[in-house]
């Protein structure tokens, strides 16, 4: 019944293991990985090329890599979507404010990535979006107005 699985990708274990299992149950399920700008994962998935020009500093923790982790099974992943540091942080704060979900930075990126992909979904699709971090680690960052303002995001 699950049509889409969406999760942030760092070292790749969650998306690769869960994606493999879901595709064994239903080969048509779509596995979507969320990546950060400054990471090599999306471009490598699309081209097979490790492009060092894709690498630059980013702030989001837990999503994106400047290496190709051995855990990432690129054949299992159907699509990567990149999310900016700013959009991930703002989405995490929005989920806390509107939904009462105190989630981590990477979860904000995952939610934002899903929003960016929403036009690809059909009304009867069943999307599983995995949030695998909590907000307590980000009280001094994403949930701190001064930190957000220092980056020009508030």
Residues covered by each model-derived region:
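Glycine-rich ThDP/TPP pyrophosphate-binding loop and its adjacent helix/strand module
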Residues: 1-30
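Conserved acidic residues
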Residues: 3-6, 78, 125
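Terminal helix/beta-alpha structural elements that buttress the NAD(P)+-binding lobe
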Residues: 4, 101, 105-111, 117, ...
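Short beta-strand segments
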Residues: 7-10, 33-35, 128-132
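Short glycine/serine/threonine-rich phosphate/pyrophosphate-binding segments
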Residues: 8-19, 41, 106-114
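N-terminal cationic-hydrophobic initiation segments that often serve targeting/anchoring roles
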Residues: 19, 23, 96, 118-119
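Active-site/ligand-binding loops adjacent to catalytic centers
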Residues: 24-105, 142-154
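Phosphate-binding loop/pocket of nucleotide- and phosphate-handling active sites
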Residues: 57, 112-154
């Amino acid at each position: 019944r699950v049509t889409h699985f969406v999760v942030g990708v760092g070292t790749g274990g969650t998306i690769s293991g869960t994606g493999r299992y879901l595709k064994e149950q239903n080969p048509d399920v779509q596995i979507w990985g969320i990546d950060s700008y400054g990471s090599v994962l999306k471009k490598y998935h699309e081209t097979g090329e490790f492009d060092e020009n894709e690498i630059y500093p980013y702030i989001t923790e837990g999503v994106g890599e400047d290496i190709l982790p051995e855990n990432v099974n690129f054949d299992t992943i159907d699509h990567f979507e990149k999310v900016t540091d700013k959009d991930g942080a703002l989405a995490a704060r929005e989920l806390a404010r509107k939904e009462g979900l105190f989630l981590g930075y990477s979860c904000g990126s995952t939610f934002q990535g899903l929003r960016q992909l929403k036009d690809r979904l059909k009304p009867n699709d069943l999307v599983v979006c995995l949030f695998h971090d909590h907000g307590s680690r980000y009280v001094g960052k994403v949930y701190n107005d001064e930190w957000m303002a220092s980056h020009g995001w508030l």
